[in-house]
UniProtKB/Swiss-Prot annotation:
Assembly, per entry: Part of the 50S ribosomal subunit.
Role according to the record: Binds to 23S rRNA.
GO term, biological process aspect, one: translation
Disulfide bonds: none
Listed Gene3D superfamilies: Ribosomal protein L14
Keyword Iron-sulfur included in the entry's annotation: no
Subcellular location: Plastid, Chloroplast
GO molecular function: large ribosomal subunit rRNA binding; structural constituent of ribosome
Annotated family: Belongs to the universal ribosomal protein uL14 family.
Organism name: Hordeum vulgare
Protein name per its UniProtKB record: Large ribosomal subunit protein uL14c
HAMAP family xrefs: Ribosomal_uL14
Protein's gene: rpl14
Keyword Ribosomal protein belongs to the record: yes
Length: 123
């Protein structure tokens, strides 16, 4: 569960390394916590030099991994080692061209198919 002030890793090659959540937009209405597949507004806390994204830039991101476990529809419980997000634009397309690490299959159902197609492993 991601809430404001939570630090997240970036799971793509857009140039940012660490994000801090400042607002949970979510999939439906006013939510306090973000789960896998929810959209957040975040600020970049750490970035690589000579990349298009800079430190202290406000961006949108979609949550792809959380430490808090969640139950799939088939009853399997999935838990990841870190909190991670993929940076997206206003239309929901990823800014990076690669996605690192495994992501959940629930993103496919939430119409983030471009992120799912870039991922090396879908659980």
């Amino acid at each position: 569960m991601i809430q404001p002030q939570t630090l997240l890793n970036v799971a793509d090659n857009s140039g940012a390394r660490k994000l801090m959540c400042i607002r949970v937009i979510g999939a439906a209405g006013n939510q306090r916590y973000a789960r896998i597949g929810d959209v957040i507004v975040a600020v970049i806390k750490d970035a690589l030099p000579q990349m298009p994204l800079e430190r202290s830039e406000v961006i949108r991101a979609v949550i792809v991994r959380t430490c808090k476990e969640f139950k799939c529809e088939d009853g399997i419980i999935i838990r990841y080692d870190d909190n991670a997000a993929v940076i997206i634009d206003q239309k929901g397309n990823p800014k990076g061209t690669r996605v690192f690490g495994a992501i959940a299959e629930e993103l496919r159902e939430l119409n983030f198919t471009k992120i799912v197609s870039l991922a090396p492993e879908v659980l």
